[in-house]
């Protein structure tokens, strides 16, 4: 009987072993549960954040989907302490097993399963934990988790076959989610300590490895005391594993928990406006008219031109991977190398902030303080102000959300007028206040906006790009998306057309007010100043003084249709620009990037260079998959470009940009043009040296938000100082290689008036103008 019982036991044991073997084989071959394909095991991490680099090698930021802000780094870029802490804490026999630690597994079964010791530790190896992270869904029950375990064992064994121990460590640390959008050790090190993984201290390493047990439970931001205790447990494990001695433990465990926490967010960092512009630009689809609202026809036309002419526009949907799918900037781990110089970008952001936030905004607030209509012009009626605010309400995210949720117009109206607790932006830091959503819209309209861009006129490389003062609160990009009236900054284009038609800078024109008949209607341009009124003055004087009468006179002698075509050649593609007499004074709306690009023709022998934002793109293995070259077109002849250059240098030396010399002590050769629109709604300044063309716009969100006084609202006050502050910082940095001593390529004996001819001028009165 006893013999038979023993045989039965052996039979049961053998049957159990056989079933285990068969079950293991079934799991191995994917007959039971999910088993990843070999290709998946060989490429277990397939979602990487795209990194955006500056031209000098700095990471400006990343593009990623939620919880996929992962930047993979190799094992040799990790601190040795990081590896030691992980092995000591999570799998002390890591280097001795092949995916499954049977000794630890047996210990866990006895102590946790049989004896019920909750703190006895688990039996999962680092490789098993990696398998769980990569391929197991979150279990909804203990039973489901029980059946997941053998699948993870098989995957762990397979991972050990395909990867070295170092590679498994790297995979684990690169994949783990450390909370706060810090996915992977590189992002975690930057988020919690503002460091690279190889630079982490022992305490910092122990803090991060402590999160591997349960990142939510030991969250260092929410539970610092609990996190510090867990850190010290990791340090104890390192002592136990022989990676440090007791004296070192005593030293490190006594240290406080010190973080340099900064949540990684696409709204933070350097060049935020450029990064968002590039993300949208590269992921754009072929423009379809029906996708654009009726009021945004201009953007449809401009996007269509970009799709046809710019390889970068819609790059992700024009280029495909080996498998035929389009590139995904959120998951493919691309490396986008921009032309931005991180140092110059920093100087540009500082210059914009210093002048707008530090000088203009306080002055604007003082001017508005006694005005009931603030921040709007006191020329507006209450009904007009109400109309502007209501339009902004319907464009707000809150309005769209409430409307989509089915709220009635009356309910939405009441909600926007009910005071609620909110946090609002100030230049001194965010503040908590009680304010209605409608009042908050009006509050934010009181902040002046700005756009700034600097580029190399010969290569097109964009060196600095500032679309606004604070991306979190003012997301609208005033460099590429915003278009405002350009005022007198359009005049160099008009003068260049005159040069192309045989005029010279020394030709004389009547400096007097005249009335023109335009399509049967009388038009009498005004001028801000009356210096040399009634005299015959040279054209170069008219441009230097930004004289409207001289510009109108020139326009009367030229073909407006030809002027519109020339603007197209300069890269100004707004389809709403039509041939008219008043076009000579700049009522058309143009972006900062278009204006800066257009001015490159004056510094580049008549050849306009389009902005070059990206030099190359690499895949996640470092292979170059795209390169980009400057796009150029000849706008005016080299000789006429030199004529324009001499006149625009006169704007600085004897004209409206003279304060560059006497107030900012700017040296060297500089060409420039100021611009101011009606009611001081827009202040422009575009200046260029032989090495850089830089433009700046300052104004309100709406045209009815502006300075009342000309002295404060003109381009020479609003925008010119930003250019000066930026250039002085650039010149002061010897590592950049820019010098005020650089000269324009003009022959020493060049005479811009060599082809001067006699010209007849009409009598003062009314001219009939062709249109």
Give the positions of each predicted feature.
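Short, well-structured active-site flanking segments
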Residues: 95-105, 183-186, 245-250, 499-519, ...
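N-terminal type II signal-anchor transmembrane helix
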Residues: 1-53, 93, 113, 359
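Active-site SXXK
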Residues: 85-87, 238, 348, 459-460, ...
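A penicillin-recognizing enzyme superfamily signal
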Residues: 338, 342-358, 391-456, 461, ...
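Non-catalytic structural connector segments
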Residues: 245-339, 343-407
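Peptidoglycan glycan-strand catalytic modules in the bacterial/periplasmic cell-wall system
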Residues: 10, 46-49, 53-304, 313-316, ...
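Short, glycine/proline-biased beta-turn/loop segments that scaffold the active-site neighborhood
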Residues: 256, 481-536, 610-624
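Active-site-adjacent helix/loop patches that line small-molecule binding or acyl-intermediate pockets
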Residues: 125-126, 134-136, 141, 145, ...
